[in-house]
Amino acid sequence: MTEAGPAGTDTDGPVSAGPVSTGSAVATAGALWAVGGVVALLVWAVYRLARISIAAFDQPFAWYHWAALLAIIPFMAWSEGLRGFQLRFSPRVAERAMTIRSQPTLLRVVLAPLYAAGYFEGTRRERLGVYFGTHGILVLIVLVHRLDQPWRGILDAGVVVGLSWGTIATLALSVRAWRS
């Protein structure tokens, strides 16, 4: 077996995480995998949470349930949808997908959704934000899971709105980045 040439180009050598041809189908597939993987995760979460949210309406709602629902939906649209996704997360996903397209490496292409989300090759601050954000979300999932209906469904309705906004923002910003 021979050693890999520059940037892992020798096909008889070991696989490397080096650069992949920029204009290649692999680079394009990697960028699509980045956005598609992130969007698939968001859509899956919306689907699961929407079912729980809809089930809340099987319970009788008092005025305070309606008040909570009417407060949580615009709050989550603003905080999660606009501030969290449209202004922070979605632009990063679009930008990093285009980085995969223009500067692909084997690692970036294979782990494209994780790269696009910022789990590696970002600044220390970005990575810490992603890891702490992920852990915070996991803690919230555990806590909300313990709530009884209709409260769980009310909170999940807000999350569904935020995640739906995030899905649309991620797709729209990615299409815009792809065209530029």
Which residue stretches match the model-derived regions?
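Membrane-proximal soluble regions of multi-pass membrane proteins
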Residues: 81-123
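Hydrophobic alpha-helical transmembrane segments of polytopic
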Residues: 33-40, 65-75, 130-133
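Juxtamembrane "helix-exit" motif on the non-cytosolic side of transmembrane helices
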Residues: 46-56, 81-86, 142-152
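Alpha-helical transmembrane segments and their immediate juxtamembrane interface regions
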Residues: 140-180
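Membrane-interface segments at the starts/ends of alpha-helical transmembrane spans
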Residues: 21-26, 54-65, 151-160
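Hydrophobic alpha-helical membrane-embedded segments
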Residues: 57-94, 168-171
